[in-house]
């Protein structure tokens, strides 16, 4: 009887929702931009949330779970959603006019990503190493900036969430609508 209850709970779609919520806290998931812009919606953030829930519900092995979140955009079509791990947290911005302000915003965003990565995947805090070595922390300032260098050389970009086939169908339909609209406008 106990085994049946466990199986029923593990097979429930609520399993992924429940355990995914813990991971989404680690990933600092938000439907908003975070930081001072939290009221500004973060489009498509829900897609990452749903990916996490589905990963738990489909019992995705942990090594793949991690690999997809770190390098899903390099693993082929269908895996890029997982890289939302790096996109759903705070993104700091400047007013765009002051180069120093822009550099500070980029540095804060980078620091947040390094700290989140180290907490999630290394189970270590790295924030102190941004400024100095600490005698009790295994991550040195050199280690911190080595990790930061990887993220600094990575670009955040918007990528299509639809497959190439879906985009082609959309383009074809849009062309048909445009042709009908143009014909209708010419007739009047």
Task: Identify the residue ranges that each predicted region occupies.
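Short, structured secondary-structure elements
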Residues: 1-163
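Short Fe-S-cluster ligation motifs
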Residues: 156-176
């Amino acid at each position: 009887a106990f085994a049946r209850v466990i199986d029923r709970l593990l097979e429930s779609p609520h399993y992924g929702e429940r355990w995914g919520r813990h991971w989404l806290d680690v990933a600092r998931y938000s439907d908003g931009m975070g930081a001072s812009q939290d009221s500004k919606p973060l489009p498509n953030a829900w897609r990452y949330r749903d990916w996490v829930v589905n990963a738990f519900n489909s019992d995705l092995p942990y090594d793949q779970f991690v690999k997809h979140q770190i390098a899903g955009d390099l693993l082929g079509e269908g895996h890029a959603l997982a890289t939302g791990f790096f996109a759903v947290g705070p993104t700091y911005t400047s007013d765009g006019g002051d180069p120093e302000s822009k550099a500070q915003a980029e540095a804060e965003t980078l620091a947040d990503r390094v700290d989140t990565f180290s907490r999630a995947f290394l189970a270590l805090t790295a924030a102190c190493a941004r400024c100095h070595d600490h005698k009790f922390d295994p991550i040195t300032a050199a280690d911190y900036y080595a990790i930061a260098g990887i993220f600094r050389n990575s670009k955040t970009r918007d990528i299509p969430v639809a497959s190439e086939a879906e985009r082609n169908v959309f383009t074809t339909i849009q062309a048909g609508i445009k042709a009908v609209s143009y014909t209708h406008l010419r007739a009047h």
